[in-house]
Amino acid sequence: MKNAAVACSLAGVFALAAILGSSSGRAAESSSLQEHHLRLYHTHTGERIDIVYRRGDQYIPEAEAQLDHFLRDHRTGDVKHYDPHVFDILSDLAAAVGHPSAEIEIICGYRTPWSNEFLRSRSAGVAKNSQHMMAHAIDIRIPGVDTLALRNAALALGRGGVGYYPRSQFVHVDTGRVRAWCYGCSSLHTNTE
């Protein structure tokens, strides 16, 4: 009788473990299939893209290629492979400001060295070794979101560089080292990266 009770108890424990294991397996499977989505509008080309770029922790190569083309140097047409973590910053930033499905306006994506030098010759706010030339940076704004609030949300993420350009109404985000600057602000330092 005692052996039967122990066997019954063990069977119950194994059944509970199987149930818990399958439900946690489903949760893991669900999170591994979570889709990460971006809606972007390029202010210089007029192009739009609405794309799932990552499922779970796996970036989608075809989506990356489409985003690389979308973010090409609009002056030369040159394309460079983007650091996909920039896409995560955009997605997380839109969520952080309460607009997870917002269409993000792209002011500038990839820049060739030629384009970067062209811009540097016209503005002191363009860095000589810009992260844009490595396809690690994007300049953005989100319609309906104050750019100062967008900058503050980007700073709160604590990932990479955050530049604030209040006169031009955009925020720069990149995957370089963590740092911040403001071009055209009197209260923040004005170094450019």
What are these regions (language model features)?
Residues 102-118:
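Acidic helix-start/capping segments at beta-turn-to-alpha-helix junctions
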